[in-house]
Structures are given as structure tokens and as C-alpha cells.
């Protein structure tokens, strides 16, 4: 039997063994994080969206990736989707949701531009800071990655970021890129409670997903130092946490000292 067919049969058998509730989003993600509910920006983005949109969902924690080799991913009434943007588009259409309906087209455009800046640019600076520049591999060790695997993961980060382009820069240049992104976001938010004003928009989920890793999961590296220059961004993180994660303490491992209960 070809390898692809074997994989399909395996996934089918797994689904037979697991019956999920109808009309409930099944969110597949890795295990809970030390100080924020996930070490993945995109898990934080998607789960915050589900809470914001008040969509019924359940978590399945594990290492199983989607057919595209990505996580997080979801199942909904037997249908599998991956990539947070496609997932959110699907759920908006399925549940007839528009979290941005109160905002103008100009505001929506600005919000998406900042989302893309953070996801396509800032993300890579944080990746280098967290997983490559730290010679002690603090992040890897805190989440329990075996020492012999760390070498291969760091090499993968180095190769991926080099191919992207940002990995060709010096650490000083990368931190300069990071700081300019954060300053731009800080200037735009100003005294707003959320990205576009006193109420959150859909893009706040993505912004929070990215900032949450700098604020809670820098593991003592430099990214957090840059973020703390901007009080309004730190306050923003706390505000998003309070608004959408009242059960935060139940969703973290507190530095791997306890098991998350949700």
C-alpha cells in the first residue's frame, strides 16, 4: 500500500475511535504553554478568535498535524481545515460572523496591514530571538525538549530564517526591525484600548497572538525588553488576557510546574 494511502487509512481509523460532538469546533493544538496558554502565536490567535466569536469548541492536545503538515488545525462536523486564516474565514461564513462590522473599510484595511506586519515580519524576529539567539536554549529546555533534538531544531530555524531572508541579517539588525515594528504598532494604538478603539476587532486576535509570545514567552531574551519600552502594548496584552481569557491560570503550566486543567 502506498505511503499516502496508509496515512489516509490511519487517519480514518483514528476518527472512528474518536467521536466528537456535532456542530462543535475541534481545535487540534500542541500542549499548553508555560506562562501563556500556548507557545504558538497561531494557536493563541485562533483560540482567542473562537472565544471572541463565542463559537462552541473543544481542545485536543497532541502532536498530530493536519494533512498539510500544519497546526493548529480544526475539525468541524468531519471536515478538516488548516491555516488560521482559512479556518477563520470558514467559521465566519459557517456561523455568519463579522467581528469587524462596526468598523469602516479604512479601519479594517489598517488592522489587516498591522496583522500582516506582525505575522509576516515581526514573527520571524521573535523566532530568531527565542529559538536561535539564545545560546542556552532556555525556551526549548523549559518546554521539555530533549537536548539531542535541540540541535536539529535550531538548525531548522537557522535554515528556514535564512531562506526567508531575515536570517541573513545580524542580530542587531533583526532587533532593529523588531523595534520598528513594535514602535509602529504602539504609535497606531496610542491610547486605544484595542487595535481600532474601545472595542476589539477580529485582527486583535492575531495581534494578541504575536504579542503574547513576546510578553509571556520570551524566556528571558531580548524581545521582551523591547516590548516593555511600550507601556500601551504591555497594557494591551493584559487587557486582551482579561477580556478573553478569564480562565488563563487554568490554561498554563506555570513554568511546567503544574498540569493545565483546561
Language-model segments: residues:
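Amphipathic alpha-helical segments that form well-ordered structural scaffolds
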Residues: 45, 49-52, 90, 177-188, ...
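GST-like fold's C-terminal all-alpha helical module
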Residues: 124-232
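Acidic carboxylate-rich catalytic motifs and surrounding loops in phosphoryl-/glycosyl-chemistry enzymes
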Residues: 59-65, 198-200, 252-256
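GST-like domain detector, emphasizing the conserved glutathione-binding G-site
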Residues: 1-152, 195, 215
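Structured alpha-helical bundle/scaffold domains in large eukaryotic membrane-trafficking regulators
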Residues: 58, 222-226, 248-256
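Generic preference for well-ordered alpha-helical elements
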Residues: 43, 84, 88, 108, ...
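C-terminal helix/juxtamembrane-tail motif
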Residues: 2, 234-262
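Short amphipathic alpha-helical interaction elements and helix-loop-helix interfaces
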Residues: 31-33, 56, 93, 97, ...
